[in-house]
């Protein structure tokens, strides 16, 4: 199961006593600020969590899997995430949840 923005808002409502509206707005503002920074070409560093970076990928040759036809894959900018050491350690040492 995935963690959603709605669940984050609910958690803030429960734990911090924020109104549901304020909790939702806080979550939205947090992600909007990350989006804004990345759109402006900035790296996003979240201490104890990880870094969001931008990476430019060059054009490269590719192949259409259905037809086998050679096609170029266009150059593009992608967002990458590199988890920090604290996050890596916590995930590595966490006990798996029953599914």
UniProtKB/Swiss-Prot annotation:
PROSITE patterns linked to this entry: HISTONE_LIKE
Keywords: DNA recombination, DNA-binding, Transcription, Transcription regulation, Translation regulation
GO process annotations (BP): DNA recombination; positive regulation of metabolic process; regulation of DNA-templated transcription; regulation of translation
Domain of life: Bacteria
Record bears the keyword Transcription: yes
GO molecular function list: DNA binding; structural constituent of chromatin
InterPro entries noted in UniProt: Hist_DNA-bd, Histone-like_DNA-bd_CS, IHF-like_DNA-bd_dom_sf, IHF_alpha
Region (Disordered): 49-75
GO cellular component terms, semicolon-separated: cytosol
Keyword Transport: no
Family: Belongs to the bacterial histone-like protein family.
Biological role: This protein is one of the two subunits of integration host factor, a specific DNA-binding protein that functions in genetic recombination as well as in transcriptional and translational control.
NCBIfam families hit by this protein: himA (TIGR00987), PRK00285.1 (NF001401)
HAMAP family in the cross-refs: IHF_alpha
Subunit and interaction comment: Heterodimer of an alpha and a beta chain.
This protein's name: Integration host factor subunit alpha
Biological source species: Klebsiella pneumoniae subsp. pneumoniae (strain ATCC 700721 / MGH 78578)
